[in-house]
Amino acid sequence: MSSIRKTYVLKLYVAGNTPNSVRALRTLNHILETEFQGVYALKVIDVLKNPQLAEEDKILATPTLAKVLPPPVRKIIGDLSDRERVLIGLDLLYEELSDGIMEY
């Protein structure tokens, strides 16, 4: 197994400092620190302050989480509280499981 680890680049689009935005960020930080310690970069974008970024990335609802790298780009819209749903939606759960496979 290779010792080189991928770096995951993620963007979280929120609309202000609402309870949903705060909860999404807290949950996402927990998932990232638990599953991807030190191999991720997260950028939080407030679409109320930066509507042009939301428009460029075709964000229609918040919260939206986008995995930019490694390709392909994946997006999850809405509730981010379910760890498994987030990992599957971003196409990350399979890689996590395959890393733990042991050969006998």
Curated annotation (Swiss-Prot):
Subunit structure: The KaiABC complex composition changes during the circadian cycle to control KaiC phosphorylation. Complexes KaiC(6), KaiA(2-4):KaiC(6), KaiB(6):KaiC(6) and KaiC(6):KaiB(6):KaiA(12) are among the most important forms, many form cooperatively. Undergoes a major conformational rearrangment; in the free state forms homotetramers as a dimer of dimers. When bound to the CI domain of KaiC switches to a monomeric thioredoxin-fold (KaiB(fs)). KaiB(fs) binds CikA, leading it to dephosphorylate phospho-RpaA.
Biological processes, Gene Ontology terms: circadian rhythm
Family: Belongs to the KaiB family.
Claim: Translocase is one of the keywords in the record: no
UniProt-recorded name of the protein: Circadian clock oscillator protein KaiB
Swiss-Prot/TrEMBL domain comment: Has 2 forms, fold switches to a thioredoxin-like fold (KaiB(fs)) when bound to KaiC.
Any coiled-coil regions, as ranges: none
Taxonomic lineage: Bacteria, Bacillati, Cyanobacteriota, Cyanophyceae, Acaryochloridales
Organism of origin: Acaryochloris marina (strain MBIC 11017)
Function: Key component of the KaiABC oscillator complex, which constitutes the main circadian regulator in cyanobacteria. Complex composition changes during the circadian cycle to control KaiC phosphorylation. KaiA stimulates KaiC autophosphorylation, while KaiB sequesters KaiA, leading to KaiC autodephosphorylation. Phospho-Ser-431 KaiC accumulation triggers binding of KaiB to form the KaiB(6):KaiC(6) complex, leading to changes in output regulators CikA and SasA. KaiB switches to a thioredoxin-like fold (KaiB(fs)) when bound to KaiC. A metamorphic protein which reversibly switches between an inactive tetrameric fold and a rare, thioredoxin-like monomeric fold (KaiB(fs)). KaiB(fs) binds phospho-KaiC, KaiA and CikA. KaiA and CikA compete for binding to KaiB(fs), and KaiB(fs) and SasA compete for binding to KaiC, thus the clock oscillator and output signal pathway are tightly coupled.
UniProt xrefs under InterPro entries: Circ_KaiB (IPR013474), KaiB-like (IPR039022), KaiB_domain (IPR011649), Thioredoxin-like_sf (IPR036249)
Superkingdom, natural source: Bacteria
Keyword annotations of the record: Biological rhythms
